[in-house]
Design a protein with these regions (language model features):
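Short Asp/Glu-rich motifs
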Residues: 41-42, 77-78, 119
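A surface-exposed regulatory interaction patch that couples sensing to output
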Residues: 75-90, 94
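Extreme N-terminal segment that seeds HTH/winged-HTH DNA-binding domains in transcriptional regulators
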Residues: 1-33, 39, 87, 91, ...
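Short, Lys/Arg-rich nucleic-acid/phosphate-binding segment
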Residues: 34, 66-74, 78
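Short hinge/loop at the helix->beta-strand junction immediately C-terminal to the helix-turn-helix recognition helix
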Residues: 27-28, 57, 62-63
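A short alpha-helical element within helix-turn-helix/winged-helix DNA-binding domains
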Residues: 33-44, 58
């Protein structure tokens, strides 16, 4: 199925951003081989030259390395991958803050809203960990 593109930015830049998201999320793990230009172009529904341009941009940024006869591989540079994840998360958070401020929310209200949304997951995780601890503790008591 072809990737979705919009008319607001050049397609090759949209491809770069999609591939960066896939790298940051681990869909393309560090050191993994990327599909060929032709295969990626078919998957995305774009001209191979457009895909080549996007991949060249990723090579220039250091996220992808080209090995002459073996293909292209995702970098294993942990710092580069952390920088990518941080810059992408910073951009997402900045956009979120701008949208929430646009709704008239103060920074304090934004922080509280985010805390409320994160808290249920944290509480659920703590409950799960406590349940596991209790089960292990009970098993240990039964053995003694």
């Amino acid at each position: 199925m072809a990737w979705k593109f919009n008319d607001n930015a050049p397609i090759y830049l949209q491809i770069v951003n999609t591939l960066k998201r896939n790298i940051a999320s681990g869909a393309y793990p560090p050191g993994s081989r990327l599909p060929s230009v032709r295969d990626l172009a078919l998957e995305a529904g774009v001209n191979p030259n457009t895909m080549q341009r996007a991949l060249s941009e990723l090579e220039r940024s250091g996220l992808v390395n080209s090995q002459r006869t073996a293909g292209r591989f995702i970098t294993e540079d942990a710092d580069a991958l952390l920088d990518l994840r941080k810059s992408m998360s910073d951009e997402i958070i900045s956009q979120l803050i701008a949208k929430l401020r646009g709704l008239g929310m103060s920074d304090e209200q934004i922080l509280e809203t985010v805390r409320e949304k994160i808290r249920p997951d944290t509480v659920r995780e703590n409950i799960s960990q406590n349940t596991i601890r209790d089960e292990i503790s009970n098993e240990h008591k039964e053995e003694t």
